[in-house]
């Protein structure tokens, strides 16, 4: 939310009791009470408390408004708990290498739904380093836009073998 505000987005914060999950009905009420909400951001699993938000229920509330994007922080959930991105209609999911993927920080992972790809094409906020369209163009050529932490790719390869072995 702080980063979105720094880029000029109008942010409506929903605060929930520390150590308690977000209430999907309160999320739904906020969407009903405020017109023009373009996206809902939610943390799937909060690291410091271990609270897992009911992302499936929140998604159902958000996706009752099909034009609203669901943005998910999966930093501490990816690789640890189920996260069926497509069936839960998550539009953007962002995660890092440093928690459930068993390796040091330095890699990030992001998924975009078709709706999110369309939204980023029309986005007016400034971007340079985190330009997903540029990253996609490089990916199509088998490259990265900047120098990657190559050693982490080797670690990720091993970590994924371990995770796949666990089922």
Residue ranges, per PLM feature:
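Active-site phosphate-binding strand-loop segment of PLP-dependent enzymes
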Residues: 22-79, 92
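Active-site C-terminal subdomain of aminotransferase-like
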Residues: 98-167
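PLP-dependent aminotransferase-like
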Residues: 1-36
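Short, structured patches in soluble enzyme cores that scaffold and shape functional sites
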Residues: 15, 41-45, 74-76, 96-97, ...
């Amino acid at each position: 939310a702080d980063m979105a505000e720094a880029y000029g987005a109008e942010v409506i914060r929903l605060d929930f009791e520390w150590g308690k999950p977000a209430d999907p009905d309160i999320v739904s009420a906020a969407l009903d009470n405020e017109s023009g909400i373009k996206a809902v951001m939610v943390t799937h699993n909060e690291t410091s408390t271990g609270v897992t938000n009911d992302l499936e229920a929140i998604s159902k509330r958000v996706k009752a408004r099909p034009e609203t994007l669901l943005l998910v922080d999966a930093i501490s959930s990816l690789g640890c708990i189920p996260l069926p991105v497509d069936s839960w209609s998550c539009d953007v999911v962002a995660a890092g290498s440093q928690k459930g993927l068993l390796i040091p920080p330095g890699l990030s992972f992001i998924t975009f739904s078709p709706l999110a790809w369309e939204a980023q094409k029309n986005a007016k906020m400034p971007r340079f380093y985190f330009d997903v369209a540029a990253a996609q163009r490089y990916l199509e050529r088998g490259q990265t836009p900047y120098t990657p932490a190559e050693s982490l790719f080797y670690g990720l390869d091993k970590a994924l073998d371990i995770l796949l072995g666990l089922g």
